[in-house]
Amino acid sequence: MTDNVLKLSRKNIKKLIPYQSARRIGGEHGNILLNANESPVSIFFKLKKKPFNRYPECQPSKLISSYAHYVNLSCNQILATRGADEGIELLIKAFCEPGKDAIIYCPPTYDMYRINATIAGVEIKEIPTIKNTWQLDLLNIKLNLSRVKLIYICNPNNPTGNIFFKKDLIFLLNITLGQALVVIDEAYIEFSPEESMTNYLKDYPNLVVLRTLSKAFALAGIRCGFTLAKKEIIQTLSKVISPYPISIPVSDIAIRSLEKDYVQLMKNRVLDSNNNRIWLINQLKNITCVETVFESNANYVLVKFSMFEKVFETLWNKGIILRNQNEKTNLKKCIRISMGTRSESLRLIKELKIFSKKNMCQGEMSEK
């Protein structure tokens, strides 16, 4: 009977390998979780007493106005979503014809661009970034624009941590005017706010910016994000979003987090995270089992290790959970490390030094 039911599923879904989220891979294993780019500290809010027997607003007006104030945009340029992930999905739903249109994504990057297109039956044009610099391959993108409706760019890029040249993003916007939308995923932009593209929304009707409260705002657990674009794009996305995407508790917490005092606390946490990242990068460069530490503009660092499998497994067994990137495009032997607290970072460095002393003898250096 089960086999008969499975036959009913779509062919592309049968073949689909779902996104391997941090909780799906790591579960509750470990006590130092450096695998999901979450804030290492939580903030707490008292919920207002409200009746929950009525449905919420589809787009809570106070939430929209609060975020509009934060990003200095008009309310009609903002759509609240269940994390930035829902924005990724809605854009494909609203703008791509299955079996006809295509998206471009540039690995190594966030996999949900590819996965959402696969689910929707939309062609994926994969144009890797330039190895080791991780910058956009503009020539190949330009040569592959036929039938493309969406170009997804994560900036800062996950998992490499780099910022894309602003002149390259503007070039993309210019060559796609009237043809495709350029979607800049700014999930990590609070860690490099000067690199945001929101100021260009007034100049480019084909620019879409995705944001989230999951990272710098330390609210991954409430799933609240935003899509920023021209009002015509927001109106189109509003046609395909579910009727009640933002629950009352989520809206209340998000509104509180956007108050002046909480925004300042967020900026303080970002400063701590950025300082910890600088410290961690300098420490990692002196570890024997580390081959390369890539510069980062976000709350994580990409590291290439000798004996990377053994490093990953050893730390896992010690309760330090990192994110293995070895299977990603051009990331052989790489592991991504999220920024934790300073004490968590000290523990990580301590264990890596112990590992190097124990394992990095001459005979094992050959894996490099």
Curated annotation (Swiss-Prot):
Superkingdom of source: Bacteria
Pathway as given in its UniProt record: Amino-acid biosynthesis; L-histidine biosynthesis; L-histidine from 5-phospho-alpha-D-ribose 1-diphosphate: step 7/9
Pfam families from the UniProt entry: Aminotran_1_2
GO biological process: L-histidine biosynthetic process
Cofactor(s), names only, from the UniProt record: pyridoxal 5'-phosphate
Keyword NAD attributed: no
Keyword entries, A-Z: Amino-acid biosynthesis, Aminotransferase, Histidine biosynthesis, Pyridoxal phosphate, Transferase
SUPFAM superfamilies xrefs: PLP-dependent transferases
The protein's assembly and partners: Homodimer.
Designated name of the protein: Histidinol-phosphate aminotransferase
Organism: Buchnera aphidicola subsp. Acyrthosiphon pisum (strain APS) (Acyrthosiphon pisum symbiotic bacterium)
Gene that specifies this protein: hisC
